[in-house]
Amino acid sequence: MNIAVVGLSHKTAPVEIREKLSIQEAKLEEALTHLRSYPHIEEVTVISTCNRLEIYAVVTDTEKGVVEITQFLSETGNIPLATLRRYLFTLLHEDAVRHLMRVAAGLESLVLGEGQILAQVRTTHKLGQKYKGVGRLLDRLFKQAITAGRRVRTETDIGTGAVSISSAAVELVHRQVDLSSQKTVIIGAGKMACLLVKHLLAKGATDITIVNRSQRRSQDLANQFPQAQLTLCPLTDMFTAIAAGDIVFTSTGATEPILNCENLTGCVINRKSLMLVDISVPRNVAADVHAMEQVRAFNVDDLKEVVAQNQASRRQMARQAEALLEEEIAAFDLWWRSLETVPTISSLRSKVEDIREQELEKALSRLGSEFAEKHQEVIEALTRGIVNKILHEPMVQLRAQQDIEARKQCLRSLKMLFDLEVEEQFG
């Protein structure tokens, strides 16, 4: 069995492609069940964020397993395979392990070192367990990656001063207008909306309206910023709020655009401009709004220029983080390679146990039934103790052997000397 990751990210695919493959949490159980139904996928889980969709899997046949994952993505996004392959990346074995460690540490994020991804990796692990996708290998891998991400944030300064998607979106607007004089509307009341409010207030915004379907969630958000006096608006009045606003941020979990050229037309009559900043994936704002003369629209891919200026000063911190990651990669690799010994050890124990039982039966039959009944438990314990003591030290040394080639040679010798039949499980 081997570990593989197949996916795409902000580095390989535009938002138009990423949004088609986004898997919302409500659909995750169905997706994992579908993936596990393929014949060559043993374990699987999915990281799905606004900037990446990555499927981590333990496969019994690497080539066939990757083909199955690619086919799943093509069907999920309704994207022809020939088109999809241009945007996908595939990483195998240690490269897949290293990639997850880098993702958890924030080194693969649009915003280098951002902290939100570690929580998303942790959620991926928990949901993978909940929906029976994560088994022994992925469980250990994700735990090691979470440890790696936590170490990077506590032992380096990479998380200090990092911009986030939300802060980059606010900075993008701040560079173009004076936020203190603008009426700002936020559609959505989740974590991203909360961060938007925080960064808007820091940049001097004073007139902020929250539009959301759930009045309770809107109020919960407003309670976190009592000094801001946020205006709360039900979703039914969304277009009234937009018509009165100058800047609109969208951050909802909608799977289809909620704003488009047709439904915004009435909001821009008799006005010079409306700025739309969509930080959702899938997008909340349809591409056709770019045709509207009064509208300036941006999405997450437009934030790269803002983010780039924050990256240069963080490269040295990233190098420190990479050194830590190598330690965690080595720790996982040592554990993973030790699994190679399991089938051989099990086969040897089974063979020795068969011999013990056969010889014990012969001895008891010679001793007679009266003696056997009286002393069988003692003799049984004696023979088990001898077998366990003989096998214990070689097994400990075999598992502890860090030299991969030396361990493989030991395994080959055991198979030959004891004529063991071993089913290979890991490669």
Swiss-Prot record:
Additional record remark: During catalysis, the active site Cys acts as a nucleophile attacking the alpha-carbonyl group of tRNA-bound glutamate with the formation of a thioester intermediate between enzyme and glutamate, and the concomitant release of tRNA(Glu). The thioester intermediate is finally reduced by direct hydride transfer from NADPH, to form the product GSA.
GO molecular function: glutamyl-tRNA reductase activity; NADP binding
Function: Catalyzes the NADPH-dependent reduction of glutamyl-tRNA(Glu) to glutamate 1-semialdehyde (GSA).
Family stated for the protein in its record: Belongs to the glutamyl-tRNA reductase family.
EC number: 1.2.1.70
Activity control, per UniProt: Feedback inhibition by heme.
Domain characteristics, as noted in the entry: Possesses an unusual extended V-shaped dimeric structure with each monomer consisting of three distinct domains arranged along a curved 'spinal' alpha-helix. The N-terminal catalytic domain specifically recognizes the glutamate moiety of the substrate. The second domain is the NADPH-binding domain, and the third C-terminal domain is responsible for dimerization.
Active site: C50 (nucleophile)
Quaternary structure, from the entry: Homodimer.
Record: residues binding substrate: T49, C50, N51, R52, S109, E114, G115, Q116, Q120
SUPFAM superfamilies given in the database record: Glutamyl tRNA-reductase catalytic, N-terminal domain (SSF69742), Glutamyl tRNA-reductase dimerization domain (SSF69075), NAD(P)-binding Rossmann-fold domains (SSF51735)
Residues where NADP(+) binds: G188, A189, G190, K191, M192, A193
HAMAP family xrefs: Glu_tRNA_reductase
Stated name of the protein: Glutamyl-tRNA reductase
Uppermost EC category: oxidoreductase
Pfam families found in the cross-reference section: GlutR_dimer, GlutR_N, Shikimate_DH
Site location (Important for activity): H99
Catalysed reaction, written as an equation: (S)-4-amino-5-oxopentanoate + tRNA(Glu) + NADP(+) = L-glutamyl-tRNA(Glu) + NADPH + H(+)
InterPro entries named among the record's database cross-references: 4pyrrol_synth_GluRdtase (IPR000343), 4pyrrol_synth_GluRdtase_dimer (IPR015896), 4pyrrol_synth_GluRdtase_N (IPR015895), GluRdtase_CS (IPR018214), GluRdtase_dimer_dom_sf (IPR036453), GluRdtase_N_sf (IPR036343), NAD(P)-bd_dom_sf (IPR036291), Shikm_DH/Glu-tRNA_Rdtase (IPR006151)
Source organism phylogeny: Bacteria, Bacillati, Cyanobacteriota, Cyanophyceae, Synechococcales
Gene Ontology biological process terms in this record: chlorophyll biosynthetic process; protoporphyrinogen IX biosynthetic process
Swiss-Prot/TrEMBL keywords: Chlorophyll biosynthesis, NADP, Oxidoreductase, Porphyrin biosynthesis
Primary gene name: hemA
Organism (species): Synechocystis sp. (strain ATCC 27184 / PCC 6803 / Kazusa)
Pathway annotation from the record: Porphyrin-containing compound metabolism; protoporphyrin-IX biosynthesis; 5-aminolevulinate from L-glutamyl-tRNA(Glu): step 1/2; Porphyrin-containing compound metabolism; chlorophyll biosynthesis
